[in-house]
């Protein structure tokens, strides 16, 4: 048979792919065995330290819950209708059961209701607020008791572009002065 025989070419390709997949699989097995001591226990997610808090490296975000799809106002509305406070609590409880221990939210009546319900149901989830209004820092802390407040990135960019970086600094200082972790 010549190398132009389609049966031979297909067979050679299959053999090559089989050898590659076997090599990859054995390499993955060796790598997994070598780093098994570095991995969290089954069912746990990796975490990082933020101050005195252990935060899962995956956090539950606010955009879908708050109705921010970046796909237009119709999708935003559908998301807001779907993520009722009760569904949001169920979603966050499911996240917590899977090892996600932190929820990043924006201040709103809905988030206040959801965080209160989570705590009433015994959740150990930690709450990280994303905000930009210095005037609302105290009220946000009183209403939702986050462990940290970060200045919203889009607002930060806008303020820096307008030469108002001092306002971002003042926001961070306000959060720190109230005893919370602060970020930008």
Give residue spans per PLM region:
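Active-site mouth loops of central-metabolism enzymes
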Residues: 71-85, 127-133, 158-161
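N-terminal twin-arginine translocation
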Residues: 10-15, 26-43
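N-terminal secretory signal peptides
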Residues: 1-12
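Active-site-adjacent beta->alpha loops and helix N-cap segments on the catalytic face
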Residues: 108-118, 157-171
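Conserved, mostly hydrophobic/aromatic
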Residues: 60, 182
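Catalytic domains of carbohydrate-active enzymes, especially glycoside hydrolases
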Residues: 86-108, 144-147
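Acidic (Asp/Glu)-rich catalytic clusters
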Residues: 115-123, 138-146
């Amino acid at each position: 048979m010549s190398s132009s025989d389609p049966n031979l070419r297909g067979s050679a390709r299959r053999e090559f792919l089989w050898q590659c997949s076997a090599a990859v699989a054995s390499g993955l097995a060796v790598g997994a065995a070598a780093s098994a001591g570095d991995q969290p226990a089954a069912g746990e997610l990796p975490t990082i330290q933020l101050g005195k808090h252990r935060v899962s490296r995956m956090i539950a975000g606010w955009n879908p819950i708050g109705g921010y799809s970046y796909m237009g106002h119709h999708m935003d509305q559908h998301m807001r209708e779907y993520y009722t406070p009760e569904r949001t609590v169920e979603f966050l409880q499911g996240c917590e059961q899977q090892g996600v221990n932190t929820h990043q939210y924006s201040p709103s009546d809905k988030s206040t209701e959801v965080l209160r319900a989570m705590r009433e149901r015994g959740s150990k989830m930690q709450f990280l607020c994303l905000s930009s209004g210095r005037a609302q820092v105290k009220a946000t802390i009183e209403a939702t008791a986050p462990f940290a407040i970060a200045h919203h990135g889009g607002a930060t960019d806008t303020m820096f572009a307008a030469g108002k970086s001092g306002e971002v600094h003042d926001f961070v200082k306000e959060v720190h002065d109230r005893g919370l972790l602060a970020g930008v």
